Each structure stands twice: as C-alpha cells, then as structure tokens.
C-alpha cells in the first residue's frame, strides 16, 4: 500500500513551541506571542486536517509560510522569504507535506541564527522530456548540500537529509519516472531543490486520497 509521508507526532516541536511562547511573554513581546499562537494554530490545523493526501499548491505554500513565520518570530530580523507562484499553478494538486519537507530541511541543515537566511520558492508550468507538468524550485542561501550527498543522491544514506531521499522515492511511487527531484548548490552559496510533477493525466501511478 502506498503511504505518503505519514504525519508523525514530534514532541520536541511542540515543546519548543511552548517554550518559545513562554519566552516571548517573559520578554514582554505580547503581540509576538499572539502572532506566534495564530501561526501555530494555522500550522497545526493543516497537519491535522482530514485524511487527504493531496492539496493545492496554494494550500501547501500557505502552510509553509506559517512555518517560516513561526521561525521569523523566534529569530527576528534573520529570515526573509519570497514565494512566486506562476499563474495557473495555484490550484494544481500536489502531495500534502511535499514542500513542507523541503522547507523544514532548510531550517534543519542550512540555518544558523547568526546568519541571515533567505528562502525563495517559485513555480512554473513546463515540459520535460515531452511531458508537461508543474516545476517547483526552492532555493536558500544557507550552507548548501555536502559534496558526498550531491554525488550519491537519491541513494538513502546517513547524511541527515533522509527526508529528501524519502521524498524522491515517494514521488516515483506516486507519479512514476516522469516525476523528478533534483538537488544542487546555488551560487555563491546555498541549496536548491527542484521538483517536477507530470500533469494529472500523465500520472503513471495516481495517488488516491
């Protein structure tokens, strides 16, 4: 049975969120605390919303924004993001948590509170190898991918980026070989993840939500 990125309860995430709220209140940053709770509510509502395995690109990017905004409150003046969705891509359905996995990977491996982080996400309708579909690119200015991962990806290794390897293999199961997930390093620094999903009628293995 095909199972797509089953939601796992991560106690440390919730404990960190509670600690952050407590810290904001202690620092008398009451408005930030209220905003944090609002973004956290949006984030959790998405996580626990029904059993759908697919959502629109617009829904997924809104969820990613909630996560980034939580980090912006926690680390003020250190994070910038820009999302640009091409016209006609907003309502295309994609696997739920697809982009969340990529964005969370940035904060797990490419973010240091001492350095300013920029995140860019864009979408476009393109054709690859004669197949039309949706291309999504997520880029940051963090530390980038280690050379050994660039050389071995998508083979699963103990490099801390197992989530991206799992994502690649999951997309192959859902869409077949027409789907792709490529990783590279941006210039002058940072990581880039490019995902291509074929149009619905081209799915080799359509996902049923």
Task: For each feature predicted by the language model, list its residue ranges.
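Two-component histidine phosphotransfer core
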Residues: 1-184, 188-196
